[in-house]
């Protein structure tokens, strides 16, 4: 999946993946991670997610990473947050008191960039990637994040043969294999097919949204 795909989605405002409220799995399961106030939290492929504001409001330092400059601009503009923009290696870094977002390719992240990240939150990153990129992405998190990192991951599971992603189906077995160096605990699972007309039209019979706690 090429960067041009996502740039076009943002340019055309085809951003059905953007949620207009804070994610309930984040609110329900993040506190149990027990991260210290002031801890830095990585939010990969963050878009302009409201979840970053929620994390900041809980006292965390948020580091989002996003390919689309349009998404980054929209985040700071829509919330009236003044941002200082500088260059940080391969990334254009946008900083405010509440949230920092690096505009660029998530695969360009280095271990030193994430050395002080104690948490990771993924609601729409893993499921945005096709299989070969998911494998690279999970390996990246395992290799670049500190060993004591903890996080929350949200996925979808459905019959991929019936409809193309994104969002892609990421079965439980793939999550556990990709995060083999982590303790993976499913903390919630919900059948959401009745709220997903696109999937019903495609003949999908089950669409399960899962939330996982990741620790190591």
Curated annotation (Swiss-Prot):
Gene3D superfamilies: Vaccinia Virus protein VP39. Its main location: cytoplasm. InterPro entries: SAM-dependent_MTases_sf, Thiopur_S-MeTfrase_Se/Te_detox, Thiopurine_S-MeTrfase, TPMT. The keyword Flavoprotein does not apply. It catalyses: S-adenosyl-L-methionine + a thiopurine = S-adenosyl-L-homocysteine + a thiopurine S-methylether. It is an enzyme of class 2 (transferase). Coiled coil: none annotated. Keywords: Cytoplasm, Methyltransferase, S-adenosyl-L-methionine, Transferase. Disulfide bonds: none annotated. GO terms for biological process: methylation; response to metal ion. GO terms for cellular component: cytoplasm. S-adenosyl-L-methionine binds at residues 10, 45, 66, 123. The keyword Transferase applies. PROSITE patterns: SAM_MT_TPMT. Its EC number is 2.1.1.67. GO terms for molecular function: thiopurine S-methyltransferase activity. It is found in: Cytoplasm. Belongs to the class I-like SAM-binding methyltransferase superfamily. TPMT family. NCBIfam families: PRK13255.1 (NF009732), TMPT_Se_Te (TIGR03840). This is Thiopurine S-methyltransferase. It comes from Pseudomonas entomophila (strain L48). The lineage of its organism: Bacteria, Pseudomonadati, Pseudomonadota, Gammaproteobacteria, Pseudomonadales.
């Amino acid at each position: 999946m090429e960067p041009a795909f996502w740039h076009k989605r943002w340019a055309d405002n085809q951003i059905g993946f953007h949620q207009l409220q804070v994610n309930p799995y984040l609110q329900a399961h993040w506190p149990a991670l027990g991260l210290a106030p002031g801890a830095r939290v990585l939010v990969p492929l963050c878009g302009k997610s409201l979840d970053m504001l929620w994390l900041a409001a809980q006292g965390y330092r948020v580091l989002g990473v996003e390919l689309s400059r349009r998404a980054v601009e929209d985040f700071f503009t829509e919330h009236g947050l003044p941002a200082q923009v500088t260059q940080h290696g391969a990334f254009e870094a946008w900083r405010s008191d509440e949230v920092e977002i690096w505009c660029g390719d998530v695969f360009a992240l280095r271990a030193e960039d994430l050395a002080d990240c104690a948490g990771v939150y993924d609601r729409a990153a893993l499921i945005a990637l096709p299989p070969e990129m998911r494998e690279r992405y999970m390996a990246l998190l395992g290799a670049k994040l500190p060993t004591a990192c903890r996080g929350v991951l949200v996925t979808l599971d459905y019959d991929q043969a019936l409809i193309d992603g994104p969002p892609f189906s990421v079965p439980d077995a793939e999550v556990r294999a990709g995060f083999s160096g982590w303790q993976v605990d499913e903390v919630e699972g919900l059948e959401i097919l009745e709220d997903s007309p696109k999937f019903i039209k495609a003949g999908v019979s089950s669409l399960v949204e899962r939330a996982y706690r990741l620790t190591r």
